[in-house]
Amino acid sequence: MMIYASLAVIAVAFVLFFVIQQKKLKSSETFSKSAMGFFNNLDGFTMSYALFGIKGPSGHTRAMAIDTERELICLYDANEKKKHHMLDYSVLASSEVFENEISISFFSDDSKILKLNFEKELSEDSKRVFNLSVECKFVSDEIPSFKIYTIHSNNPVDNNEYLFKKEETNKWHHLMVKIIDYNNQPVKHID
C-alpha cells in the first residue's frame, strides 16, 4: 500500500513539474516574439544575433540583440517596453547585466538554438578580463552552420583602436574584439 502511495506522489510531482515547465516555455515564446518585433523596428540597428532571456539584477526578463556591424548591443526589458539600453561593445564590462557569469540557452521560433556565455575574471595584474561568446546553432541538418563571437579585454586601448582576429572554417567563425575604455564609456539610454 505504501508503495502505491509513493508512486502516486511521484507521478503527481512529475505532472506538476511538466505543467510548470510548459508554462515557462510559453511565457518565453511570447516574450521572444515581442522582443524580436521590437528589435526589427529599431532605427539604426540591424540584428546579427538575437535574442536572449536574461534575468537582470531587478529580476526582470530582458532580451538582447547584437549588431556586429555597428558594434552595438541592445538590451530590452520586458517591464519597460518603451525604454531600451544601447551598449557599445566597450561598455560591456560596466554593464550591470553582466555582473555574474551568465549561461543561457534560448529556443527561437525559427528552430535556432541561441546560447550566450559571459565570464569575467581578474588577470594577474588585476585588470579585468571579459569574454562573451554567442553561439547560434541551426537545428535543421540542411544548415549545419555554427557561429561564435568572442569579445575579450585585457587592457583598455585607444578610443578608436579595435583589434580583430577572424578565423573561418566550414562550421565556425570567430571574431575577437578588444573592449575599449570600459571604465569611462557611459551607457546610452534611449527612450
Q: What are the functions of these language-model segments?
A:
Residues 72-74, 80-83, 141-149:
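Short, surface-exposed beta-strand/loop "edge" segments at domain boundaries and coil↔beta transitions
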Residues 79-81, 89-93, 151-156:
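A short, sequence-level motif marking secondary-structure junctions
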Residues 86-102:
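Phosphoinositide-dependent membrane-docking surfaces
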Residues 69, 83-85, 132:
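Core residues of folded domains in eukaryotic genome-function proteins
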Residues 63-65, 84, 94:
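Short, surface-exposed charged micro-motifs
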Residues 97-191:
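Acidic, Ser/Thr- and proline-rich intrinsically disordered linker/docking segments
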Residues 3-79:
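Anionic N-terminal interaction surfaces
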